[in-house]
């Protein structure tokens, strides 16, 4: 290798049978370990079953002619297009600098190509659209068909971050997969030039702990076990120790190679093979390798959440999703929450979680398309329905995700929630949300040790009526509690009267759910007038005479109903189920 090669990773994504592997083969000059459908199962079925890697080398754009560091190594990551293998695509997208979306020009956007576009928006900054199989278009109408599909793709990309992305026509394998190799691919030289113009040399950071995403593991007789993958962070040198966290095993690096060339060190972004001894390759097909004790294994996590707009249906608390985190996809149960309503407009914090703040429990993720229209007599939306008061959306939302089995992952890693159990043949997006893992809960007993410190609350509202006045500072209330309710639990809580006074629940009154309310500031004359009813009793002369109700007779209702409102917070993870009111 003359000078150091600068490595960039280009993802080749698209719908099944769009010609991704043929395109990667046409572009490549050097085949990596797993490239070009080497898996027998994959060759038999004609689809890419796992991440295939290959590369080609071109002069570094802008480099001085003849300089020792003039080579740009473009590593192609051929992701499978088969719908049931979307887990693998998600794992691959996390190591991609630029994405090539391969479209069958005769079919246009299909279900998996749309999902790949969604993943690209989450995990990638740049896109090139490749219209493949142009050789299948009738020669006389070819350019018109290419122009028509180009316009369609431009319209598709209009509302994405990839608006204005370049679109190029090619024929990676003229005549189809069974055709002889005699006919040369079309448009590949132009595609390489386009990629060179689009690739910006990523800034690689050698600092931080070593972390590598491993996609294949195999043994070489007399050498040891080789793990191939892409370095996500940090650096590695010969003789360093690495941990395979899923197995809790630490091994020493015996040798390293980049595309069959021995190297002594490698850094973030490099495609690498690491050789270790006395390790069974069957124990690790895909996963993570890291500096010892640099990753954490978590049973639950606090994550930031952003809904994917193409996902139909709500994101509901207590729902289960397939959660892709690190290199694993596991089932997880979600609980959504947002800032307190007065903090909805605060600037989002993307790299940490503040346990000192209070958060509002949501029955579902809040988004504008889930906002209800106001109903008559309902001033505020029902928090249970997962809608914000007044239709106002918070700028940031979070979720507690509880995993069905522990996962090993880096801190602040990408998280994607999806519904991979949905019918793969329907034309719907199965990717539901994405976010960042802000805090992992490593303690198996996190429910007792951590969750009580997470101040997520529900707002509770109870409504009742004032039955009558006892004196200037006391009234009797009813219809707030059931007969069997232990009113003692509510003693000391404040209630608001519709006449404006504030009262405090003092004690139970009888056995029927009624209660006594103390009014510290006393009742106003207007309130007393409303609450003190009068009866008319006929005198002997037949004239109406006002009297007070006699003791023992049924008490009449106040002149007009006076309502009581009891509002309090109940913290979701408070084991004592306390009711809290703000001063």
Curated annotation (Swiss-Prot):
Chain ranges of the tr-type G domain: 5-203
In-chain residues carrying the UniProt-annotated modification Phosphoserine: 524
Stretches the record annotates as G4: 132-135
Subcellular localization, as worded in the UniProt entry: Cytoplasm; Nucleus
Residues bearing the modification Omega-N-methylarginine: 543
Biological process according to GO: selenocysteine incorporation
CDD domains: eSelB_III (cd04094), SelB_euk (cd01889), SelB_II (cd03696)
Chain spans, region G5: 171-173
Superkingdom classification of source: Eukaryota
Residue list for modification Phosphothreonine: 532
Motif range (Nuclear localization signal): 534-540
Required cofactor(s): Mg(2+); Mn(2+)
Region G1, annotated ranges: 14-21
Function: Translation factor required for the incorporation of the rare amino acid selenocysteine encoded by UGA codons. Replaces the eRF1-eRF3-GTP ternary complex for the insertion of selenocysteine directed by the UGA codon. Insertion of selenocysteine at UGA codons is mediated by SECISBP2 and EEFSEC: SECISBP2 (1) specifically binds the SECIS sequence once the 80S ribosome encounters an in-frame UGA codon and (2) contacts the RPS27A/eS31 of the 40S ribosome before ribosome stalling.
Protein name: Selenocysteine-specific elongation factor
Native source organism of the sequence: Mus musculus
